[in-house]
């Protein structure tokens, strides 16, 4: 069994190859050549010490959540990703979303590899969005607006610029200007972007009311909007940004890639935005429990599950044909991603093969 560290994953990965691998796995999904059971969510609790006699004995405190996500890509790979959400890890200098993938041999079932998968998770999510950009965005986009300044935001920018060299402006909005400044330096240093070719800008502070008008102005300019945050509330007002008085969507179509939320209480997009868009998802079951869909379907009753027009696998296979929405004349598409294990396993298998080719990783015989 091969142990592959996070640092080795970063050395081995090629963003273009990851996009190609993920596009192929969505094509296989369209041919029903994958198996992807629903994820299992396990709340991780610990017993709190009793502070006084009035408190209940054995009171439980939620530490975090673990998600178990198995999948099979027929004739290629099988495995499981275990990913957690542990907010207090930030205080310990650890990833708040730790992830590990176990790959098994498709002939014997034995474990082939254990792979640090935090970077893989970011890369496969960004690859899904990049694929949606390839098929659903305007042909020659010039401007991206990105909410967030994390690894997820970085990988989205890198992959989208890789596929769409026509892009000239990138606006990045985050609560921390310092984090955005660091991200911009990193983007320029790691990708050798010519300062004259791509203009990177910090745009206001997400969540700051005084900056709303500035954010809205640049959102109206954007051809692609990416939301990659942990926000509990919508990041912008759809009534203001998606107004036909402000923008001719037939002449300037809009693609929104929403990847940050996965729980019913969290959402980055409001119900107006969702209900007035052509909605594509990566995985129906996972997205149905994200706030973007759960709230307008189950709490507000303004749309139904049928508002989902297709999956990304339908897009890449040609089963889904892009259209203007039936509710308005706008040409607005939302690609909602909550993550699918077929991407995790396919991307991990790609890393495993490259590690073998490059003699990277630590071999351990656990069956000895």
UniProtKB/Swiss-Prot annotation:
Sections of the chain in a coiled coil: none
EC number(s) on file: 4.3.1.-
Keyword Flavoprotein: no
InterPro entries reported in the protein's UniProt record: NAD(P)-bd_dom_sf (IPR036291), ODC_Mu_crystall (IPR003462), ODC_N (IPR023401)
GO CC terms in record: cytoplasm
UniProt keyword list: Lyase
Record bears the keyword Cell inner membrane: no
Similarity remark: Belongs to the ornithine cyclodeaminase/mu-crystallin family.
The name this protein goes by in its record: Uncharacterized cyclodeaminase
Organism field: Dictyostelium discoideum
